């Protein structure tokens, strides 16, 4: 027996040559239903392999690409206007980079480097329109934007602080019996939602919410599903539902909160005539309504019926024991599951108004049918049943790529590698000090409801194509801590290093006492990405693109 012969055979790496892959695609169609996946593999050959550090940009705040990749939006430096750019393609600056070898154009002072950094932005992005949106002292929220499915329009939000003097009237602040008490951590503001036509730059429609609290950051307080837009008023505990028309206008559909049907006021006024009389004279006082808010009433009825179905006296006693606490629950977040169903998170008023930030506070998730006005299900934030639904049907909560003909969601329910990451995270919490299974469930369900359009569809973040450290970059479009080293992307099928992304400046001493954040914006399908590093008030913009070295 020859002991020098290894019994472990090295893994055979598939041919990575792009010509070979093109020829293979030509002569072999592959398994049925895998055509799009086979085409997507070519992103392992065409990737953003070149970084230009510290690109000069106009005085604006960069936001994101439209889902079809044609447009890029930004907010003006004074946050009153929306700037609409047309993307010119990943090859737009290839002539500028002729002769450059390597992977990085650093922050050099030579004339050519300075010229490239100064001209690069206008090569990739051509300004089409500047639309003045915010008025009356309002400022656009830089983290709020929703694109319609046809990529024709974009919805943005603006807000203006209310002055201390004169203080708004009491019944403007408290418009129904569920209204919360504002505080300095959660101040009241005047809000406006605007819809702009990307093709013409025209401001098509605006809806205002005076003396209110709507969480605009990261689209937390508004959700767009196809042509249905839902907006949660945290202050008034009301969900406003609109239909977005192809022409870019808002149509009132329903208002959910104090009432669930539009004609509920007529029914109530038959029993309480003073409600109708006060409404007609402009002296309405719904804050002192003698009845329970309609949406809250449906929640309580569902819980009571569930206690009755249980059949035990203990279930009914628990309902009575916690009845007052259930009445004090307030809506915190919500999302649309489809055109008819809302997914609402209820918690205590202290959490809703940011008086308490303890994530261990009890909360409930409610599935509500807007058409039939029925509560379909209620889950606690420690529910194993809801976690199982979330893990197995995560894509239905994300609605990440509704606009795409072909879906490539990179979630725990559709991607083995994303599932592994989630399992590791779950096991880490279970085994941690003060952890455990219940804490792991609470932490995982803390992601719900999921904000609209908060996940990138870029193939370079697809975990089935590339392996990378999700600590530094991920499919969720949120700022990440900036690392000291480049982010490396390895091909999933071969394990070979394909490209690196360098965020921030090179060669500068790193101050670890200052928190450095970086936000990535990937093009939906082309090999192009933008990273914006923020350190205190300083912004560094890097472009990551495809460059053919000659």
From Swiss-Prot:
Query: Gene name, please?
Result: Det1
Known InterPro entries for this protein? De-etiolated_protein_1_Det1
Of which family is this protein a member?
A: Belongs to the DET1 family.
One molecular function GO term is:
protein-containing complex binding
Question: Native species of this protein?
Answer: Mus musculus
Q: Which protein are we looking at?
A: DET1 homolog
Pfam families cross-referenced by the UniProt entry: Det1 (PF09737)
State whether keyword Transit peptide applies. Answer: no
What keywords tag this UniProt record? Nucleus, Ubl conjugation pathway
Q: Name one GO cellular component term.
A: nucleus
First and last residue of the signal peptide? none
Its annotated function is as follows:
Component of the E3 ubiquitin ligase DCX DET1-COP1 complex, which is required for ubiquitination and subsequent degradation of target proteins. The complex is involved in JUN ubiquitination and degradation.
Q: Which compartment or compartments is the protein found in?
A: Nucleus
| UniProt entry tagged with the keyword Cell cycle | no
Provide the GO biological process annotations. Answer: positive regulation of proteasomal ubiquitin-dependent protein catabolic process; protein ubiquitination; protein-containing complex assembly
Lineage of producing organism: Eukaryota, Metazoa, Chordata, Craniata, Vertebrata
Q: Which coarse location class describes where this protein primarily resides?
A: nucleus
Q: How does it assemble?
A: Component of the DCX DET1-COP1 ubiquitin ligase complex at least composed of RBX1, DET1, DDB1, CUL4A and COP1.
